[in-house]
Amino acid sequence: MPAIQPPLYPTFLLLILLSLIITLYVWIISTITYKTAVRHASLYQRSFSRWSFDHSL
């Protein structure tokens, strides 16, 4: 009976690896989008970004 049950440790390790890959992928995408957004804001939304920052405080 125990032979039918899949080993828990390798599946757990695979899950951790998968989650790490997913988090890294999301982090890279978010940083890239943030950098592009900041670049665009600094290019043609300088006054608007300053106004939003002043009103957010």
Swiss-Prot record:
Main localization (coarse): virion
Membrane topology: Single-pass membrane protein
GO biological process: symbiont-mediated suppression of host NF-kappaB cascade
Residue intervals annotated with topology Virion surface: 1-8
UniProt cross-references to InterPro entries, sorted A to Z: SH (IPR001477)
Intravirion-facing ranges: 30-57
The keyword Transmembrane is annotated on this UniProt entry: yes
Pfam family, one: SH
Regions crossing the membrane: 9-29
GO CC term (a single one): virion membrane
Keywords of the record: Host cell membrane, Host membrane, Host-virus interaction, Inhibition of host NF-kappa-B by virus, Membrane, Transmembrane, Transmembrane helix, Virion
Cell compartment(s), UniProt: Virion membrane; Host cell membrane
Subunit relationships: Interacts with host TNFRSF1A, RIPK1 and IRAK1; these interactions interfere with host NF-kappa-B activation at the level of receptor complexes. Interacts with host protein UBQLN4.
Family the UniProt entry places it in: Belongs to the rubulavirus small hydrophobic protein family.
Record function comment: Plays a role in the inhibition of the host NF-kappa-B pathway. This inhibition occurs at the receptor level, by preventing the signaling of TNFR1 as well as IL-1R and TLR3.
Protein name: Small hydrophobic protein
Organism of derivation: Mumps virus (strain Matsuyama) (MuV)
Gene designation: SH
